[in-house]
């Protein structure tokens, strides 16, 4: 069978051209109809699309899914060519194609709308995303800030925690202290109640000022702050303050009293020192030169205490100085030499002050007589020393001077006031004054002389006795002697004569101390006389009488061993009286051997003094060969002194024999003349002008030798023995005068 298209083609081919034209017109008509149908369907789709857009998006997918099959069905129907009209095949195909195109366009439009919507929503979401990102950044910044705040807060927390711990510890301590203070306050209240003390009141309930308030803080071993202690003390000062003021006032009064007593004691010390200065001027200390003595002598011119106080002080100081003299006799001799040499170059008023220290013991008119005679004796001594230096002979001088008394050293000070002049004229003037004072006062002179001798002995007694006992004996003897003597002219004569004798006798003091048989009495006053010594011969008897009495009194004070040796020495003296003596040359040689330590200055002085003395002694030996009746007793008394001295005396005694070169017989003639003169004139011992001076010179030489023994062998003697010696001296003096 054939197809319809083949059949139609066969018909066209069969028809005429006219038939072909009509067929084409019908095809064009069909095509136009189909286009119109498509446009109508498109409009309907658009209308439906608008409705879909107005619906929610949920329903959009559902509607689209429902419409698609319909559209697809319509399009498929149109595209299938299955039209309701029977037409050609071309018309049906075109109608389906258009419908499908329209549906595709509608779906495209919908997809584009959906895309647009998706793009809008995407942009919105993007905006939201950026917003959220910004918010996240800000939140992160806030988080960092918060983290920093958290760290700071943690640090502060730690600090606060530590501070809290400290505060907690301090709080615990304060609580403990608070408990202690509370306990202390409780104890304080208990103490106050116990003692009945009311604070902040001037009067206590019990009427007593108790110190318990100040001691409350120390009662218990608890700790109390300074404020509380100050409060307690301030509260306690109410009653206790007055007591403290009273104690302070008492202390002030005691201090003022002590100052006044110190001032009084300081004022008394210069007075004591003035008394001691007088004695220091009288005695040259060992190791001290005459130049050093002068300031002390000047200081003694100042006013001091009463004469009685001076006497006691001088006695004590003399005893102490006698001990120092015994220890170093060599220094004493050397100081005497230097004092003499210095005295010839300078004339000073110091000797009067030196002598005044010891002579102040004599009061009344005696002091005036002493002053007059001291000036005369010092003038005569100065002349004698100058003459001694003018001669160029040598005299031995021992290194040791034994038993020098403070009087000897005192007179050494007086040598410094030596002036030129005729010595014999001075002696005559002194003798005139002595004779005037001695007329009718023989008994009183003897008593005063014995008193003075005993004073000299008692001063040396201080070596063995205590100072208190010595002062007691000395005061008793002074009072007894002053009551017995109505006038002290004789004493003045004796003291001044002794001063002159000491000045002349110093170079020969050691030589006087001889062996028991050697004649020890040498008149130092003979040094001043030349070949014709007639005046000296006339003045020597009375001096020897005084010398004899003085030596006897001092020998009486020796110990029992010394008294036993007197008889032996008298016998030896008689046997050795006529013994030959060494020559002056041999004596000078021996002295040069014995004195190796003596300086050149001392040797020159000794040579000059020796020549002068030998020139004075030789004429006397020729003119006075007679013996005196009492000369042996005097020699025996002189020998008893050096027997107790040191062993150095033996060597010196041999020199004495050579220096003396005389026998005891040569000195007895003037004594006999003096006894005759005394018998003719009665109580007046001698009126020759120079007798007193000569007697003092020889008497003091014996006194020096006796005192050397006294210082060596004295033990403690009582005042009774001194009184017995005074009586014995009186009786012996009467015997010699008869």
Curated annotation (Swiss-Prot):
InterPro entries documented for this protein: LRRFIP1/2 (IPR019139)
Q: Origin, by domain of life?
A: Eukaryota
About its domains, the entry says: The DNA-binding domain is intrinsically unstructured. The coiled coil mediates dimerization.
Gene Ontology annotations of biological process type: negative regulation of transcription by RNA polymerase II; regulation of transcription by RNA polymerase II
Question: Bias category Basic residues: which stretches?
Answer: 563-577
- Indicate where the modification N-acetylthreonine is found in the sequence: 2
What name appears for this protein in its UniProt entry?
Leucine-rich repeat flightless-interacting protein 1
Quote the Pfam families the UniProt record gives.
Answer: LRRFIP
- Induction entry: Up-regulated after artery wall injury (at protein level).
Location of the protein in the cell? Nucleus; Cytoplasm
Gene Ontology cellular-component terms listed: cytoplasm; nucleus
Region span, DNA-binding: 479-580
Which parts of the chain are coiled coil?
Answer: 94-194
Q: Which organism is it from?
A: Rattus norvegicus (Rat)
Residues with PTM Phosphoserine: 16, 83-84, 88, 92, 302, 346, 348, 551, 560, 675, 701
Describe the task this protein carries out: Transcriptional repressor which preferentially binds to the GC-rich consensus sequence (5'-AGCCCCCGGCG-3') and may regulate expression of TNF, EGFR and PDGFA. May control smooth muscle cells proliferation following artery injury through PDGFA repression. May also bind double-stranded RNA. Positively regulates Toll-like receptor (TLR) signaling in response to agonist probably by competing with the negative FLII regulator for MYD88-binding.
Matching Gene3D superfamilies: 1.20.5.4090
Per UniProt, the ranges with Low complexity bias are 78-94
Bias class Polar residues marks the residues at 314-326, 371-380, 483-495, 520-534
GO MF annotations in UniProt: DNA binding; DNA-binding transcription factor activity, RNA polymerase II-specific; DNA-binding transcription repressor activity, RNA polymerase II-specific; protein homodimerization activity; RNA polymerase II cis-regulatory region sequence-specific DNA binding
Location of the region described as Disordered in the Swiss-Prot/TrEMBL record: 40-98, 253-738
The cross-link Glycyl lysine isopeptide (Lys-Gly) (interchain with G-Cter in SUMO1): at which residues?
Answer: 249
Q: Bias category Basic and acidic residues: which stretches?
A: 40-65, 253-262, 277-297, 330-347, 381-400, 467-476, 535-553, 606-626, 691-703, 720-738
Q: Which UniProt keywords apply?
A: Acetylation, Coiled coil, Cytoplasm, DNA-binding, Isopeptide bond, Nucleus, Phosphoprotein, Repressor, Transcription, Transcription regulation, Ubl conjugation
């Amino acid at each position: 069978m054939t197809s319809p298209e083949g059949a139609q083609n066969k018909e066209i081919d069969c028809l005429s051209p006219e038939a072909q034209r009509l067929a084409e017109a019908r095809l064009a008509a069909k095509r136009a109809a189909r286009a119109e149908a498509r446009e109508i369907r498109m409009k309907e789709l658009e209308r439906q699309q608008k409705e879909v857009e107005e619906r929610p998006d949920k329903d959009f997918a559902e509607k689209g899914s429902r419409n698609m099959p319909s559209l697809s069905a319509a399009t498929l129907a149109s595209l299938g060519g299955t039209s309701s009209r029977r037409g050609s095949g071309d018309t049906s195909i075109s109608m389906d194609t258009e419908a499908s195109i329209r549906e595709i366009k509608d779906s495209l439009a919908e997809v584009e709308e959906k895309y647009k919507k998706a793009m809008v929503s995407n942009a919105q979401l993007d905006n939201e995303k950026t917003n959220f990102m910004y918010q996240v950044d800000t939140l992160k910044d806030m988080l960092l800030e918060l983290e920093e705040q958290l760290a700071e807060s943690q640090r502060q927390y730690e600090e606060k925690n530590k501070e809290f711990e400290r505060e907690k510890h301090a709080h615990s301590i304060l609580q403990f202290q608070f408990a202690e203070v509370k306990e202390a306050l409780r104890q304080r209240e208990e103490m106050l109640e116990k003692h009945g003390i009311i604070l902040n009141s001037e009067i206590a309930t019990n009427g007593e000022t108790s110190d318990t308030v100040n001691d409350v803080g120390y009662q218990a071993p608890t700790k109390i702050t300074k404020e509380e202690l100050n409060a307690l003390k301030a509260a306690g000062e109410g009653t206790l303050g007055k007591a403290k003021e009273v104690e302070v006032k008492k202390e002030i009064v005691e201090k003022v009293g002590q100052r006044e007593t110190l001032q009084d004691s300081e004022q008394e010390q210069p007075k004591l020192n003035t008394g001691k200065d007088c004695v220091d001027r009288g005695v040259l200390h060992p190791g001290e030169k005459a130049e050093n003595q002068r300031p002390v002598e000047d200081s003694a011119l100042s006013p001091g205490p009463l004469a009685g106080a001076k006497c006691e002080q001088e006695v004590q100081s003399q005893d102490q100085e006698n001990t120092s003299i015994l220890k170093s006799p060599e220094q004493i001799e050397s100081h005497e030499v230097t004092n003499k040499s210095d005295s010839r170059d300078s004339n000073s008023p110091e000797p009067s002050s030196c002598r005044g220290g010891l002579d102040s013991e004599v009061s009344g008119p005696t002091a005036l007589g002493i002053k007059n005679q001291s000036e005369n004796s010092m003038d005569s001594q100065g002349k004698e020393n100058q003459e001694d230096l003018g001669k160029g002979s040598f005299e031995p001088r021992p290194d040791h001077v034994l038993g020098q008394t403070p009087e000897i050293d005192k007179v050494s000070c007086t040598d410094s006031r030596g002036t030129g002049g005729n010595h014999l004229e001075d002696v005559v003037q002194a003798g005139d004054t002595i004779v005037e004072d001695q007329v009718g006062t023989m008994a009183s002179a003897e008593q005063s002389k014995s008193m003075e001798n005993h004073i000299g002995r008692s001063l040396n007694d201080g070596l063995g006795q205590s100072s208190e006992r010595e002062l007691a004996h000395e005061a008793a003897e002074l009072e007894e002697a002053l009551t017995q003597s109505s006038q002290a002219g004789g004493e003045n004569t004796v003291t001044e004569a002794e001063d002159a004798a000491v000045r002349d006798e110093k170079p020969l003091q050691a030589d006087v101390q001889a062996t028991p048989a050697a004649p020890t009495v040498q008149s130092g006053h003979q040094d001043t006389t030349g070949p014709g010594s007639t005046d000296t011969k006339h003045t020597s008897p009375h001096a020897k009488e005084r010398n004899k009495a003085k030596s006897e009194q001092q020998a009486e004070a020796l110990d029992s061993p010394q008294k036993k040796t007197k008889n032996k020495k008298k016998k030896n003296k008689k046997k050795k009286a006529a013994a030959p003596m060494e020559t002056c040359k041999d004596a000078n040689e021996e002295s040069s051997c014995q004195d190796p330590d003596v300086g050149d200055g001392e040797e020159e002085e000794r040579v000059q003094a020796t020549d002068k003395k030998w020139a004075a002694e030789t004429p006397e030996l020729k003119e006075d060969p007679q013996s005196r009746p009492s000369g042996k007793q005097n020699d025996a008394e002189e020998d008893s002194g050096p027997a107790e001295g040191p062993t150095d005396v033996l060597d010196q005694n041999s020199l004495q024999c050579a220096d003396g070169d005389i026998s005891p017989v040569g000195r007895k003639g003037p004594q006999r003349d003096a006894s005759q003169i005394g018998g003719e004139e009665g109580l007046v011992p001698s009126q020759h002008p120079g007798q007193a001076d000569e007697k003092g010179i020889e008497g003091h030489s014996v006194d020096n030798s006796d005192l050397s023994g006294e210082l060596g062998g004295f033990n403690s003697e009582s005042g009774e023995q001194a009184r017995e010696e005074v009586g014995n001296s009186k009786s012996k003096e009467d015997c010699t005068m008869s």
